[in-house]
């Protein structure tokens, strides 16, 4: 509630914790496409958005459920899934002629190694330039899920029942969590081969 004559009531979306208008203005002034990354409890969402006179236009928009198309059996909200989502979004952006973008993480804290930066890394590896500092990018080991695999191996040896409970969803999908890094590489290879072929065909036309 306003408390004085000089008190300024924030914009509704800022009050609701949805939009940082100062940051958004800087992004819009750059005149570059925005790589918008958002999180839900179960999935990650990534979009390539272009500001138009009539409003924002989403030219690419996907969430991690798309990974099942390539046989992904891991969780859909972890670092590995975030990277793979970024990889697909990056390839789709290239197919639409987009060569660079600026990361827009909204009100998320820019914590080094966070999943939003794993999405960004995937987009970059697909061939789209995104300005960033190397210190925020998750390590290759973390992107591959090495930390999950190591923890799973240790837990399986020390507490088999706890292992089954902790990784029940992985096991139900037919993926032993200690095999996550190799599974990640298999899915990544499928994505790269699929989209590289599509891009090559588009160029050959």
Curated annotation (Swiss-Prot):
<dbReference type="GO" id="GO:0022625">
    <property type="term" value="C:cytosolic large ribosomal subunit"/>
</dbReference>
<comment type="function">
    <text>This is one of the proteins that bind and probably mediate the attachment of the 5S RNA into the large ribosomal subunit, where it forms part of the central protuberance.</text>
</comment>
<dbReference type="GO" id="GO:0008097">
    <property type="term" value="F:5S rRNA binding"/>
</dbReference>
<protein>
    <recommendedName>
        <fullName>Large ribosomal subunit protein uL18</fullName>
    </recommendedName>
</protein>
<dbReference type="GO" id="GO:0000027">
    <property type="term" value="P:ribosomal large subunit assembly"/>
</dbReference>
<dbReference type="GO" id="GO:0006412">
    <property type="term" value="P:translation"/>
</dbReference>
<dbReference type="Pfam" id="PF17144">
    <property type="entry name" value="Ribosomal_L5e"/>
</dbReference>
<keyword id="KW-0694">RNA-binding</keyword>
<comment type="similarity">
    <text>Belongs to the universal ribosomal protein uL18 family.</text>
</comment>
<comment type="subunit">
    <text>Part of the 50S ribosomal subunit. Contacts the 5S and 23S rRNAs.</text>
</comment>
<dbReference type="GO" id="GO:0003735">
    <property type="term" value="F:structural constituent of ribosome"/>
</dbReference>
<keyword id="KW-0689">Ribosomal protein</keyword>
<keyword id="KW-0699">rRNA-binding</keyword>
<dbReference type="InterPro" id="IPR005485">
    <property type="entry name" value="Rbsml_uL18_euk"/>
</dbReference>
<keyword id="KW-0687">Ribonucleoprotein</keyword>
């Amino acid at each position: 509630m306003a408390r004085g004559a000089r008190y300024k009531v924030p914009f509704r979306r800022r009050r609701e914790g949805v939009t940082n208008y100062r940051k958004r203005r800087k992004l819009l002034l750059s005149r570059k496409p925005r790589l918008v990354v958002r999180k839900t409890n179960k999935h990650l969402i990534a979009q390539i958005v272009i500001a138009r006179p009539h409003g924002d236009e989403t030219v690419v928009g996907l969430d991690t459920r798309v990974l099942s198309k390539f046989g992904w059996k891991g969780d859909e909200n972890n670092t590995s899934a975030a990277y793979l989502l970024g990889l697909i979004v990056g390839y789709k952006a290239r197919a639409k002629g987009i060569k660079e973008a600026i990361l827009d993480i909204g009100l998320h804290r820019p914590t080094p190694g966070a999943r939003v930066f794993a999405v960004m890394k995937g987009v970059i590896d697909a061939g789209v330039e995104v300005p960033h500092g190397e210190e925020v990018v998750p390590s290759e080991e973390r992107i591959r899920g090495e930390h999950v695999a190591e923890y799973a191996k240790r837990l399986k040896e020390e507490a088999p029942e706890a292992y089954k409970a902790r990784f029940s969803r992985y096991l139900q999908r037919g993926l032993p969590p200690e095999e996550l890094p190799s599974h990640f590489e298999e899915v990544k290879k499928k994505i790269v081969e699929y989209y590289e072929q599509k891009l090559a065909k588009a160029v050959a036309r």
